[in-house]
Amino acid sequence: MIGKITGRLEYRASDHVLIDVRGVGYLVFCSERTLAALPGVGEVVALYTDLLVREDVMQLFGFTTLTEKEWHRLLTSVQGVGAKASLAILGTLGADGVSRAIALGDWNAVKAAKGVGPKIAQRVVLDLKDKAPSVMGMSDTQATVAAQSSDAVIETRAAPSPVVQNPSAQAEALSALSNLGYAPGDAAAAVAQAAGELPDAETPDLIRAALKRLAPKG
């Protein structure tokens, strides 16, 4: 299975791009948010990928971060949510926004995605609420282009390419609260609330804000 692809961006459409890898063109479907973050045509691009194989179709989906890829995998595991709906949700909310919406049980935020109705949105939140803490705790590793190789397809079993580790303040705050003994679901909801109100907060500020929300009322 192809886990990451690096090559030159040949063209972009409304829902996909064509990436040339040593003369072979790979059609990669992406969310609107991911498409907007990609470089211009002719430049080198790197994406984490997920391959969908069915009897009648084989499609490759691309993501700029492992967190986005993991949410796509989880979203498409929900009954009634296909790849198109998953990309719509990720395009509307982004990976962090999906984490916050699901941790807080905010199905209205999920419903804002094109083609996602209230029943599906509620099912997404209900089915994935317990998954949010583990995804929020992931290091948000971003797909990067290795300077020595602009044309390579990297399989998941191959040696890993250089990556930039950038643990988010959200992940660090969640880890700290878990170490303090808070339940994963409670910690995730508190961090999600704090991150929504303080999007640029550093880890210590995010922890303090989350602790205020976890403090007993009264």
From Swiss-Prot:
Keyword Ubl conjugation: no
Origin superkingdom: Bacteria
Role this protein plays: The RuvA-RuvB-RuvC complex processes Holliday junction (HJ) DNA during genetic recombination and DNA repair, while the RuvA-RuvB complex plays an important role in the rescue of blocked DNA replication forks via replication fork reversal (RFR). RuvA specifically binds to HJ cruciform DNA, conferring on it an open structure. The RuvB hexamer acts as an ATP-dependent pump, pulling dsDNA into and through the RuvAB complex. HJ branch migration allows RuvC to scan DNA until it finds its consensus sequence, where it cleaves and resolves the cruciform DNA.
Name of this chain's protein: Holliday junction branch migration complex subunit RuvA
Region feature (Domain I): 1-64
CDD domains (alphabetical): UBA_RuvA_C
Spans annotated as Flexible linker: 144-164
Record's keyword terms, sorted: Cytoplasm, DNA damage, DNA recombination, DNA repair, DNA-binding
UniProt KW Cytoplasm keyword: yes
Entry's Gene Ontology BP terms: DNA recombination; DNA repair
CC terms in the record's Gene Ontology section: cytoplasm; Holliday junction helicase complex; Holliday junction resolvase complex
Family according to the record: Belongs to the RuvA family.
Comment text on domains: Has three domains with a flexible linker between the domains II and III and assumes an 'L' shape. Domain III is highly mobile and contacts RuvB.
Region (Domain II): 65-143
InterPro entries on file: DNA_helicase_Holl-junc_RuvA_I, NA-bd_OB-fold, RuvA, RuvA_2-like, RuvA_C, RuvA_C_sf
HAMAP family for this protein: DNA_HJ_migration_RuvA (MF_00031)
Residue numbers spanned by region Domain III: 165-218
MF terms (GO), sorted A to Z: ATP binding; four-way junction DNA binding; four-way junction helicase activity
Subunit structure comment from the entry: Homotetramer. Forms an RuvA(8)-RuvB(12)-Holliday junction (HJ) complex. HJ DNA is sandwiched between 2 RuvA tetramers; dsDNA enters through RuvA and exits via RuvB. An RuvB hexamer assembles on each DNA strand where it exits the tetramer. Each RuvB hexamer is contacted by two RuvA subunits (via domain III) on 2 adjacent RuvB subunits; this complex drives branch migration. In the full resolvosome a probable DNA-RuvA(4)-RuvB(12)-RuvC(2) complex forms which resolves the HJ.
Subcellular location: Cytoplasm
N-terminal signal peptide: none
Taxonomic source organism: Roseobacter denitrificans (strain ATCC 33942 / OCh 114)
